[in-house]
């Protein structure tokens, strides 16, 4: 009982799907599933790019703050 390793398991699953949805509906379901997967991947990619851009912005802000603090310290020491 190693799961769905037998070809007969897959044949039965496909037969049940055809009986439930009909042969005409299966291409529409596959198209919808493919479209959903494509949209999901695009959303994940967009989120990753947004996170990278945010990280770059935060890093730049931290660098500017550090430079500003360093220049303030130097000006106080010179006074």
Swiss-Prot record:
The chain crosses the membrane at residues 1-21. InterPro entries: TatA/B/E (IPR003369), TatA/E (IPR006312). The keyword rRNA-binding does not apply. Keywords: Cell inner membrane, Cell membrane, Membrane, Protein transport, Translocation, Transmembrane, Transmembrane helix, Transport. It is found in: Cell inner membrane. GO terms for cellular component: TAT protein transport complex. It is a single-pass membrane protein. One of its GO terms (biological process) is protein transport by the Tat complex. Residues 66-79 have a biased composition (Basic and acidic residues). One of its GO terms (molecular function) is protein transmembrane transporter activity. Residues 54-79 are annotated as: Disordered. The keyword Cell membrane applies. It comes from the Bacteria. NCBIfam families: tatAE. The Tat system comprises two distinct complexes: a TatABC complex, containing multiple copies of TatA, TatB and TatC subunits, and a separate TatA complex, containing only TatA subunits. Substrates initially bind to the TatABC complex, which probably triggers association of the separate TatA complex to form the active translocon. Belongs to the TatA/E family. Part of the twin-arginine translocation (Tat) system that transports large folded proteins containing a characteristic twin-arginine motif in their signal peptide across membranes. TatA could form the protein-conducting channel of the Tat system. This is Sec-independent protein translocase protein TatA.
